[in-house]
Amino acid sequence: MDKVKIALQYMLPKHLLSRLVGKLAASEAGALTTAAIKWFIKQYKIDMSEAAQSEPEAYKSFNDFFTRALKPGIRPINTAANIMVHPVDGAVSQLGPIKDGRIFQAKGHHYSSLTLLGDQAEDAKRFEGGDFATIYLAPKDYHRIHMPIKGTLSKMTYVPGELFSVNPLTARHVPGLFARNERVVAIFETELGPLAMVLVGATIVASIETVWAGTITPPTGKQVFTWEYPTVGPDAITLDKGEEMGRFKLGSTVVMLFAKDAIDTFAEGVEPEAVTRMGQAFANLKNQASAD
């Protein structure tokens, strides 16, 4: 059965399907939209008591529901200076060291940090010998992405690619999955060195957004685009630990890259398949400089 599912991944018109779903998710269809939201809540057992707007009727579109805000304080941020926090609700797929520019995906599969970052060689060099973490967001999860530590945006890269589904099954069977799919790479300068937040697209992910640039995808294309940002002065974009940096309209995966010697140890219980909650302790930092 797994082989059939993977074969379908290669056969499906993934970009066309994703654009169609995106249009439907953005539509405001009144009672039909509310019915779809209620079905989704029941199907995926979503706890709406955490949402700022708990009633399905409050959402004009499915996208509004999917990117719903949480009630203030429902995800308290660990403010300890030596702690990096989880950026999302989800589940850890993999984490560990970046060795010789290679990142572990699943048993028998690695991919290149250079390819992941859109063949930006200077960026890839900055993370050699560092660490990575891959976190999967399931359909039921809260889909806003937050900063694990304070950082100032220096660069954003849009990398075109495939739109394979992103889940444990495809991670095991699709070589180089995260470096093949469409993605947005945001690089921040922090007191611990560079931080890369890679937002990976997937089948029926309607769009990827950032708080500073809005919707990055769609439109899709075949060309890599880069944007440079000032890191000092009035136009610098600095986000605090726990502050929102982006969101998915429908689910996917975040890959984080950390500089060498930024992380001392991952926090207790942070391991593959562990459930994550935004704001909780993710890693202990080697550098004791303030990260909040």
UniProtKB/Swiss-Prot annotation:
* Protein localization: Cell membrane
Give the reaction(s) catalysed.
Answer: a 1,2-diacyl-sn-glycero-3-phospho-L-serine + H(+) = a 1,2-diacyl-sn-glycero-3-phosphoethanolamine + CO2
According to its UniProt record, in which pathway does this protein act? Phospholipid metabolism; phosphatidylethanolamine biosynthesis; phosphatidylethanolamine from CDP-diacylglycerol: step 2/2
Q: Which residues carry this modification: Pyruvic acid (Ser)?
A: S252
Task: Name its GO BP terms in alphabetical order.
Answer: phosphatidylethanolamine biosynthetic process
Topology relative to the membrane, per the entry? Peripheral membrane protein
Which parts of the sequence are marked as the site Cleavage (non-hydrolytic)? G251, S252
Known function: Catalyzes the formation of phosphatidylethanolamine (PtdEtn) from phosphatidylserine (PtdSer).
Q: How is the cofactor bound?
A: Binds 1 pyruvoyl group covalently per subunit.
Active site, renumbered: D89 (charge relay system), H146 (charge relay system), S252 (charge relay system), S252 (schiff-base intermediate with substrate)
What cofactors does this protein use? pyruvate
GO CC annotation: what is one? plasma membrane
- Name of this chain's protein: Phosphatidylserine decarboxylase proenzyme
State the family named in the UniProt similarity comment for this chain: Belongs to the phosphatidylserine decarboxylase family. PSD-B subfamily. Prokaryotic type I sub-subfamily.
